Amino acid sequence: MTKKILLAVSGSIAAYKAADLSHQLTKLGYHVNVLMTNAAKQFIPPLTLQVLSKNPVYSNVMKEDDPQVINHIALAKQADLFLLAPASANTLAHLAHGFADNIVTSVALALPLEVPKFFAPAMNTKMYENPITQSNIALLKKFGYKEIQPKSSVLACGDVGSGALADLDTIIQKIEEQL
């Protein structure tokens, strides 16, 4: 049976890497459903992820094409794994504190407890190291989320430090170890 991965993409310059990630996961035989925040759509168009995942992209929690299906509940029920990559500081904060104000956070809150949940942060070093962000990460870990650590690299702003999205090979390895 094909394993179903929910790939949640939040607003980070690293969102463009979700295209390659969804493509690689699909090539490995996973069924990938992509969820996007509005901020993520500013960095990469949903159509790109739809073509590469070969599935519709969900970006509006209030859009229900089929009145018989409540998307955020249905997606959560069928997931074998949830991956937030890239995970912005904003989306991590929303998840840690139970906000369900977009498709990503609504699906995440509706996930069955036994579904493995991963997040791969991608943000400026100062944002990543901020005590508020670290507190949110600790809270998510307490709730059962697993962090795929960011790497140290030259960031979009030119700074060098921790906060770059983990290599896709690392992310995929963590997923395959879990599934």
Curated annotation (Swiss-Prot):
Gene Ontology BP annotations: coenzyme A biosynthetic process
**Entries under Pfam families matching the protein:** Flavoprotein (PF02441)
Q: How is the cofactor bound?
A: Binds 1 FMN per subunit.
UniProt keyword list: Decarboxylase, Flavoprotein, FMN, Lyase
Q: Identify the cofactor(s).
A: FMN
Q: Which residues form a coiled coil?
A: none
Which residues belong to the signal peptide in this entry? none
Q: Which residues bind substrate?
A: 124
Known catalysed reaction(s)?
A: N-[(R)-4-phosphopantothenoyl]-L-cysteine + H(+) = (R)-4'-phosphopantetheine + CO2
Q: In which pathway does it act?
A: Cofactor biosynthesis; coenzyme A biosynthesis; CoA from (R)-pantothenate: step 3/5
- Which catalytic residues are annotated? 157 (proton donor)
Q: Extract the GO molecular function terms from the UniProt entry.
A: FMN binding; phosphopantothenoylcysteine decarboxylase activity
Gene Ontology cellular component terms for the protein in this record: phosphopantothenoylcysteine decarboxylase complex
EC annotation from Swiss-Prot or TrEMBL: 4.1.1.36
Instruction: State the superkingdom.
Output: Bacteria
Which sequence ranges are marked TM in the entry? none
Q: Which InterPro entries match?
A: CoaC_strep, Flavin_trans-like, Flavoprotein
Q: What class of enzyme is it?
A: lyase
Q: What does this protein do?
A: Catalyzes the decarboxylation of 4'-phosphopantothenoylcysteine to 4'-phosphopantetheine.
Q: Which family does it belong to?
A: Belongs to the HFCD (homooligomeric flavin containing Cys decarboxylase) superfamily.
Put simply, this protein is called Probable phosphopantothenoylcysteine decarboxylase
Q: Which organism is it from?
A: Streptococcus mutans serotype c (strain ATCC 700610 / UA159)
> Per UniProt, what is the name of the gene that codes for the protein in this document?
coaC
